[in-house]
Amino acid sequence: MNWPQIEEITYSECDNPHKLLGPHKQGSKMLVQAYFPGAEKVTIHWKKTGQVGEAFLTDVPMELADEEGYFAALVNAGKMSPYEYVVEYGKTKEHAAYRKICGDAYRHVPQITKEDMDRFAAGIHYTIYEKLGAHPMELDGDAGTYFAVWAPNAMRVSVVGDFNEWDGRMHQMRRL
């Protein structure tokens, strides 16, 4: 594990969280890393796809690798099946203990291509509105909203909402 990069994530100073978060091949296994500040427990839950011959997959508990809420698990798989996180939070003064299920935005590749970026930089991308902003879509069976903004001088950009308790440390976006 790359501790300087983990610190960049926990301090919200990382300009490419996809480089660390989500699934990454490690030999014949996959290292899955996630950041959920304040969570006590995170489990990888395999979605059932209904494919013929699909093997039964056991949920994988993730290890709390950093007390700031950084979790990791080494999964015995050369390729990741569709999954989601089950995140458990303990009781605090503000709220009772609860759990939530959420997808992993970091398992998806950017929807803005190098060609899009080159055309935009040259001032000839006449349909950039199709790429920037908020766009509901489905990627690899995950339904959600894709976000992209042009913020060349921003130190960090995050997507926030009630789905992440308006916490800007979560759902950090990558600089393209």
Task: Describe the role of every protein-language-model region.
Residues 1-38, 97-155:
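Non-catalytic, glycine-rich low-complexity segments
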Residues 23, 33-80, 86-103, 139, ...:
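Aromatic-rich carbohydrate-binding modules that target alpha-glucans
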